[in-house]
Regions:
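Alpha-helical, largely C-terminal catalytic domains
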Residues: 1-169
Length: 169
């Protein structure tokens, strides 16, 4: 364990959660983000399929005496523990950077601006955490230093979310 801010991080738990949280992609493949984010209904359906396939895998492939352990390890790792919250933030940072990269390269697909917005909204929900405060204060501003198509819109979205709590204003 390590103290970060005023909280103790259990690095072993965080490592296990990080290692296993995308395990379900083994069953359905890594569906490209724009496809996953095409509609909320599709995202929900993909999650349901992943969950059912994971349960089936555990039931059919894992010896009975280890099924409870694997059910826990392969379940949703983004829980209310400190480590689950850190994983949620990291996952959204990954998505935010994916969207940023596509926008910076000039990809006109509006799904990337939506991904950027939704990622930042989720990250903002954890703004009581030291790592998020650091990201907002020191890292996020660097994203807007260069010139690229979509920069002004991204800045407006970030400003609205971080200062007003609503990107639609």
């Amino acid at each position: 364990e390590e103290v970060v801010g005023k909280q103790k991080v259990n690095w072993k738990a965080l490592y296990e959660k990080s290692l296993n949280h995308d395990y379900t992609e083994r069953f359905i493949g890594d569906i490209k983000t724009p496809v996953k984010y095409a509609t909320p209904q599709l995202r929900k359906m993909i999650g349901e399929v992943e969950e059912k396939m994971t349960q089936k895998f555990i039931k059919e492939e894992i010896p009975k005496e280890f099924q409870a352990i694997y059910t826990k390890r392969l379940s949703e790792a983004k829980d209310d523990t400190l480590e689950g919250k850190i994983l949620s933030i990291c996952d959204k940072l990954d998505l935010l950077y994916e969207a940023y990269g596509e926008i910076e390269l000039g990809n006109p697909n509006p799904v990337f601006m939506q991904m950027f917005k939704e990622s930042l909204e989720t990250i903002k929900k954890y703004d009581d955490m030291v790592c998020v405060q650091y990201f907002i204060k020191h890292i996020l501003p660097d994203l807007f230093k260069g010139d690229f198509a979509g920069k002004d819109k991204m800045q407006r979205i970030a400003f609205s979310i971080l200062l007003m709590g609503d990107a639609d204003k």
